[in-house]
């Protein structure tokens, strides 16, 4: 009986530790450098030590494509926050295109969250994301911020826009 309690206690401890670790954000590395390019509303280039350029895709968000409504404004918003600034990237590793996927910080500002809060990007729910972004998106939507002020037929999530373009171009 005493041995059974010890085993059950050990299993419980392992389970608790696994749950705690599972809830922690995983960061492959942290990068620091100057933002030297903004490609669109969710992709930038960071100049890091050794004069190396790293293309960074902001994790957990998806901004309108440049060719869709609000795409240029999303790029301008990211540029206003980040271009020329010293940034820190908490990287989650590469995406399927080889870009560094990560959360961008300018000082204490979480740029990914700021873009969602301003209504210039959607939360990208295709992949695991920070649930706090959901609340920021709801706030932007409810207040009519950014792209949420567009007519409903112009508020097409980028992942649907890209899919539609693939069908048309095919």
Where are these regions (language model features)?
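Small beta-barrel nucleic-acid-binding modules, primarily SNase/OB-fold domains
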Residues: 2-170
């Amino acid at each position: 009986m005493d041995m059974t309690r010890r085993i059950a206690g050990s299993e419980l401890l392992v389970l608790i530790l696994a749950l705690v670790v599972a809830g922690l954000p995983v960061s492959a590395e942290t990068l620091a450098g100057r933002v030297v390019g903004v490609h669109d509303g969710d992709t930038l280039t960071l100049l890091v030590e050794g004069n190396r350029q790293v293309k960074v895709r902001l994790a957990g968000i998806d901004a309108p494509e440049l060719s869709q409504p609000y795409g240029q404004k999303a790029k301008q918003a990211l540029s206003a926050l980040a271009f020329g600034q010293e940034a820190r990237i908490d990287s989650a590793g590469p995406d399927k295109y080889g870009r560094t996927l990560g959360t961008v910080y300018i000082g204490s500002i979480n740029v990914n969250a700021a873009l969602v809060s301003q209504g210039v990007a959607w939360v990208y729910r295709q992949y695991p994301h920070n649930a706090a972004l959901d609340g920021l998106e709801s706030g932007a939507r409810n207040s009519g911020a950014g792209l949420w002020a567009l007519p409903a037929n112009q508020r097409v999530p980028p992942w649907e826009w890209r899919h539609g373009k693939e069908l048309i171009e095919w």
